[in-house]
């Protein structure tokens, strides 16, 4: 596979010319919107980028892509993104809200949102994947946040009621810390 890293619109991407895909690999620190002293309200991950007049679908967010970036309070991840790698948003202290619009694979026990102030998730995907994502957050000691009970999870209005009842309307346990977390589930998307 032939890949190249290119700078486009404030981000670096690793592109694959063969299948016209791109993985957001890191921020461009020279871009003024990512200065440490500036907090943006919203960061929208693009669904595509261009290189040499060719369009590339943004399909992933790389390992540590936004690590220790404090420039945004929320991130909106489009349907084109199908994976987020470990530590992608590690230590993003300003991050409070994540919108995940598609069927994203998030590796287990990899601290994608560790050491953030995440208090709200908007999840448009599969309910069972959401359950395992939340279970991973609660059971992973390194990413456990004491205020998870205060976290609100927004899901689609048309979500399967039986799946919601079976997977989300019960506490998730952290056996090592002897804790149970009951997320607030809101069907409003």
Model regions and ranges:
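N-terminal low-complexity, Pro/Thr/Ser-rich intrinsically disordered segments
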Residues: 1-9
């Amino acid at each position: 596979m032939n890949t190249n890293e290119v700078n486009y619109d404030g981000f670096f991407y690793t592109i694959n010319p063969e299948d016209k895909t791109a993985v957001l690999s890191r921020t461009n620190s020279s871009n003024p919107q990512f200065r440490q002293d500036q907090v943006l309200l919203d960061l929208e991950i693009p669904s595509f980028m261009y290189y040499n007049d060719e369009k590339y679908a943004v399909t992933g967010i790389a390992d540590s892509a936004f690590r220790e970036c404090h420039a945004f309070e929320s991130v909106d991840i489009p349907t084109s993104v199908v994976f987020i790698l470990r530590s992608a948003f590690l230590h993003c202290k300003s991050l409070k809200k994540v919108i995940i619009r598609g069927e994203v694979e998030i590796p287990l026990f990899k601290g994608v949102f560790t050491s953030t102030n995440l208090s709200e998730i908007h999840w448009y995907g599969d309910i069972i994947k959401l359950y395992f994502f939340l279970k991973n957050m609660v059971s992973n000691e390194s990413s456990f946040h004491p205020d998870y009970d205060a976290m609100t999870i927004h899901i689609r209005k048309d979500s399967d009621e039986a799946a919601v009842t079976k997977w989300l309307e019960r506490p998730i346990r952290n056996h090592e810390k002897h804790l149970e977390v009951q997320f607030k589930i809101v069907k409003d998307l």
